[in-house]
Amino acid sequence: MTLLKIKVPASSANLGPGFDALGLALALYDRVELQITDAGLKIEVTDVGAGGVDDVPTDESHLVVRAFRRGCEHLGLRPPGVHLRCFNAIPHARGLGSSASAVVTGVAAAYALAEKPLDDDTLQLAAEFEGHADNAAASLLGGFVVAWNEGERFRAERLQPHHDIRPVVAVPALRSSTDATRGLLPERVPHADAAFTAGRAALAVHALTARPDLLLSATEDRLHQHYRASAYPASSELVRALRAEGVAAAISGAGPTVLALTTEGILPAGVDVTSFDVTELPIDPGGVQVAAQ
């Protein structure tokens, strides 16, 4: 029976001002082996750095399975049975795109089973699970992505990030729900704040691709981070402390992980990170990889 091996990167979204629009693929990988069987569903989950997988379902509600089923439906496939082996390294509920990675894994596996190349519908299928395309596009395409909507259609473009940028992530033990933190956002924001953040988002694209020296200014945001600061005060304080030291830091996605876009691959020695797991994560260049056996 067909065996698919999938490797998918983590991602960091928003990057400060690019709310639901900017994403960066990071070299931290979940690996999945998906085997087509005669019947039934079997799921095995192994923690290889995710920090706990006890809450991961092992039935049809598993996100990889749901995305795989949706991809198969789209492509007209009806696999008889599935055996899934998941090796999870991306921390769950930390703002590093674990759910988007799972969705991309499932959809990409369906395309591989159909022996079809990834296309625009691949992103559409993945982003529909999330409601936004920034994380999914980063895990799918790799590198630095700009995502947007055209009506109900999700779109994204991959850009080449500047070679000097060396991301560092600071991951706390605290978990955070994307739905919960989105609930902290107001329905309306002042026009001046929206205009400020739009300018910074445009600058962020330039800084990330050509001018890393502008990243400190380019990662400023008035649209979402301060509204959600109460959900993870230690992370918000770390962002403040890093920025005071000249480091371009922001909350990664919905948090609570802190992303620092450095050119040295380390954080300043004087900043207290004792309650965080700090790691340099290079930018992943290629996105999801699937091998069929």
Regions inferred by a protein language model and the residue ranges of each:
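Short beta-strand segments
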Residues: K7-P9, A25, S139-L141, W148, ...
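Short beta-strand-to-loop capping motifs
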Residues: N149, P172, A260-E264
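Active-site rim beta-loop-alpha module in soluble metabolic enzymes
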Residues: V169-S230
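Glycine-rich, charge-dense phosphate/pyrophosphate-binding loop(s)
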Residues: A207-Q293
